[in-house]
């Protein structure tokens, strides 16, 4: 069987609240780490979320 094209990665809040999103990423096309501005409900603001390894 072939390897799947996408992997799951965790986007963790930079506000140190512990809040995170799990998203799919194609490592062949996107070699850099992902960073998005998303909503963190624990601080009730949009903050940067950075990619970390999903354990």
Swiss-Prot record:
GO terms for cellular component: cytoplasm; large ribosomal subunit. Keywords: Ribonucleoprotein, Ribosomal protein. It comes from the Bacteria. Disulfide bonds: none annotated. One of its GO terms (molecular function) is structural constituent of ribosome. GO terms for biological process: translation. NCBIfam families: PRK00595.1, rpmG_bact. This is Large ribosomal subunit protein bL33. The gene is rpmG.
